[in-house]
Amino acid sequence: MKKIKKIIQIGMIGGLAAVAGGALAGCGSNNDNADTLNQAANAQGAFVIIEETAPGQYKIKDQYPSDETRVVLKDLNGTERILSKEEMDALIKEEAAKIDNGTSNLTKDNGQISSGGLSLGETLLASAAGAILGSWIGSKLFNNQNFANQQRGAFSNQSAYQRSVNSFNKAGTTSSASSAKKSGFFGGGSKATSSSSSFGS
C-alpha cells in the first residue's frame, strides 16, 4: 500500500512539473505565438469570426485556416453576416491611416488605450485575415511589441487565442511547401472572397 501511495505521489509531482514547465514556456512565447499566427496565414486563407462585445468594440471569437479568407461579423443582437472584400479593404485602409498618424490602438500599449477596446478595423487587422488582406502595411507593424500584445488581447479569451495558434501552427507545418512562394505582410498572400451573403441562414 505504501508503494502505491509513493508511485501516485511521484506521478502527481511529475505531472505538476510538466504543467508548470508548459505554463512557463507559454509565458515566454507571446511573440512566438503571434508569429505563428501571422506566418501560418501565408499558406492558406483564414475563416474568422468577430463578435461585437459592446457598442463599437469587437473581439475575435474564433479563427482557423481555410481555403479562402472569410470574415463573419456577429453584432450585439446576434445577427451574423459575412463582410465583403470591399468592406474589409475599406476598414484596413482606414486603419492604416490611423497607424500613420499614431491614433490606432494596435500600436499603443495597454495603458494608452482609452476606448476600452478595439474597433472593427483594429480587430480585423489583428486577425489572420488582416495579415492576409493587409499585406501592404506590414512594415508599419513588423516587430512592434505593442501590436503583438494587442493582437493577443484581440481574442475573446485566452483559450480562443491558443486554439487559433495551434490550428494555424498545425496547418503551417502541413503546407510549408506552398508558403515558400508567398510574400507580404507577415508573409501573407492575398486570397479573399467577396461574398456578402448571410451566414447561418
From Swiss-Prot:
Lipid linkage positions (S-diacylglycerol cysteine): C27
Assigned keywords, A-Z: Cell membrane, Lipoprotein, Membrane, Palmitate, Signal
Organism domain of life: Bacteria
Lipoprotein recorded as keyword: yes
Main location: membrane
Residues where lipid is bound covalently (N-palmitoyl cysteine): C27
Family per similarity comment: Belongs to the UPF0323 family.
HAMAP family tied to this protein: UPF0323 (MF_01421)
The protein's name: UPF0323 lipoprotein Cj0371
Organism the protein comes from: Campylobacter jejuni subsp. jejuni serotype O:2 (strain ATCC 700819 / NCTC 11168)
